[in-house]
Amino acid sequence: MLSKEKINRINELSAKAKNGQLTDEEAKERTALRKEYLDTFRATMRDTIENVKVVDAEGNDVTPEKVRQAKKNKFLN
């Protein structure tokens, strides 16, 4: 999870960019922070999806095959 300070900094830089007052150095910092945020988000989402088990009303496991394979590959690596 990204720290509160980094998220606040992303928001500060975005607000500054809306006003057109962003320096080249700040634009690079914003790009790096956004990339870090998206990488963290994607990893968390992937982990969440890989740990989901879908069950129908009758109690049968109907988890999509792609998710099952991802889960299996995760434990093999």
Swiss-Prot record:
Subcellular location, record wording: Cytoplasm
Annotated keywords: Cytoplasm
SUPFAM superfamilies on file: YnzC-like (SSF158221)
InterPro entries linked to this entry: DUF896
Gene Ontology terms: cellular component: cytoplasm
Similarity remark: Belongs to the UPF0291 family.
Protein's name in the database: UPF0291 protein Bsph_1689
